[in-house]
Curated annotation (Swiss-Prot):
The gene is panD. GO terms for cellular component: cytosol. It catalyses: L-aspartate + H(+) = beta-alanine + CO2. Heterooctamer of four alpha and four beta subunits. Binds 1 pyruvoyl group covalently per subunit. This is Aspartate 1-decarboxylase.
Length: 127
């Protein structure tokens, strides 16, 4: 049997742009993608901490070092520039793989710079 587990997370990213007229997706600074192992075209879930909205889309790599987190297309209706979001990717794996899997979590500051890298989420922690 296969299980779907969190693979990577960008925690507390700030929305830098919302572009309604783009085809779709989320544009994310490629340095952030590399740090947690996310890839172009990968399906992600985005949770908006400001309004509770949840959506699924796919990744487009953004300019390195820019800190860009831009929601494109219809998803732009669910965010405002400055909103705090959580971007999560998932992976399917066997139960054996799941037993040793360690997700990569990047905790970001208000400029979308990595403040801390976590190998797992500690229980009952507020970040």
């Amino acid at each position: 049997m296969y299980r779907t587990l969190m693979s990577a997370k960008l925690h507390r990213a700030r929305v830098t742009e919302a572009n309604l007229n783009y085809v779709g997706s989320v544009t994310i600074d490629e340095d952030l993608l590399d740090a947690v192992g996310m890839m172009a075209n990968e399906k992600v879930q985005i949770v908006n901490n400001n309004n509770g909205a949840r959506l699924e889309t796919y990744i487009i790599p953004g300019e390195r070092g820019s800190g860009v987190v831009c929601l494109n297309g219809a998803a732009a209706r669910l965010v405002q520039v400055g909103d705090v979001v959580i971007i999560v990717s998932y992976a399917m794996m066997s139960e054996e793989e799941a037993k040793t899997h360690k997700p990569k979590v990047a905790v970001l500051n208000e400029r979308n710079e990595i403040e801390e890298m976590l190998g797992q989420e500690p229980a009952r922690t507020i970040l």
